[in-house]
């Protein structure tokens, strides 16, 4: 769904007494997401609103998060992630690269996913640096976004989102003091989804390696997130990814768009 209409559809559905599952980023801009939250709160309805950051529900991410919470790789230090695709002919004419409809380019598109994942592993970011650039596509929005995000405790996320990644790529690496977790692939055109665990020994040197393969023919993250949404309704529990997450995500994106740096 084009970003420009997400907040309007959400409010319309809530006023009609419906629970809402809204695609990320939930609104076209930071101002729109702030206004949406205010309006939702004023409705005072006991309705669920879940935001569709489906990458949280990939089995490799679920497994990695569980391992981090169990302190298997020790205290986290930093994250490094690359996410990109090669687009298609005349991609610059599509709505995703029309700022009026999308709100931005690759940062708000694929970039929002790896920002979201970085948040759930490292926490909130207090320092943001970014470089946004259109290298290839003739568009007024960026086709590449480079971000360095830092938490209050100086944990760092290095993120690169691109639609000039000629071979589709998803890589998400989590570095801890006892080891490293690496998620590679999402299935389909992004290659088989795998989770690598590099366990460091006390003497360092070559780590032990364990690999989990997730070879489902379909992307089950969509099914997982909808099942999670339905469960939150049936059990009347808090949604796992709500408007607060969309707000924090868009706050970072807004900061980047306000302070664009050219290469």
Where would I find each of the regions flagged by the language model?
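Beta-loop-alpha module in the N-terminal Rossmann-like domain of NAD(P)-dependent dehydrogenases
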Residues: 1-38
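A short helix->loop->beta-strand "cap" motif at the edges of active sites that frequently abuts
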Residues: 16-18, 43-48, 155
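Short glycine/proline- and charge-enriched loop/turn segments
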Residues: 17, 93-101, 204-212
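Hydrophobic residues in well-ordered beta-strands that form the structural core
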Residues: 22-23, 49-51, 183
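A short acidic, glycine-rich active-site loop
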Residues: 23, 100-108, 211-216
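C-terminal helix-rich "cap/oligomerization" subdomain common to oxidoreductases
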Residues: 34, 42, 70, 152, ...
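Predominantly a Rossmann-like dinucleotide-binding segment in NAD(P)-dependent oxidoreductases
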Residues: 47, 55-138
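Contiguous beta-strand/loop segments that form the cofactor/metal-binding neighborhood of enzyme cores
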Residues: 116-189, 221-238, 254
């Amino acid at each position: 769904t084009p970003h420009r209409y997400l907040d309007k559809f959400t409010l319309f559905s809530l006023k009609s007494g419906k629970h809402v599952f809204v695609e990320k980023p939930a609104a076209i801009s930071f101002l729109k997401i702030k206004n949406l939250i205010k309006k939702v709160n004023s409705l005072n309805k006991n309705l669920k609103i879940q935001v569709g950051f489906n990458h949280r529900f990939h089995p490799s991410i679920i497994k990695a998060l569980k391992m981090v919470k169990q302190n298997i790789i020790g205290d986290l230090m930093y994250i490094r992630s690359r996410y990109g695709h090669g687009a298609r002919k005349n991609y610059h004419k599509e709505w995703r690269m029309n700022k009026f409809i999308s709100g931005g380019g690759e940062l708000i598109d694929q970039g929002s996913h790896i920002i979201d994942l970085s948040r759930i592993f490292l926490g909130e970011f207090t320092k943001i640096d970014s470089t946004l650039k259109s290298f290839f596509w003739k568009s007024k929005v960026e086709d590449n976004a480079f971000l360095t995000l830092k938490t209050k405790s100086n944990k760092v996320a290095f993120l690169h989102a691109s639609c000039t990644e000629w071979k589709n790529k998803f890589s998400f690496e989590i570095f801890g003091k006892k080891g490293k977790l690496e998620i590679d692939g999402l299935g389909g055109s992004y290659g088989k989804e795998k989770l690598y665990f590099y366990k460091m020994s006390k003497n360092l040197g070559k780590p032990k390696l364990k690999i989990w393969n997730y070879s489902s023919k379909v992307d089950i993250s969509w099914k997982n997130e909808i099942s999670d949404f339905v469960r939150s309704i049936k059990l009347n529990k808090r949604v796992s990814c709500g408007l607060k997450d969309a707000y924090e995500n868009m706050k970072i994106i807004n900061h980047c768009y306000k302070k664009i740096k050219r290469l």
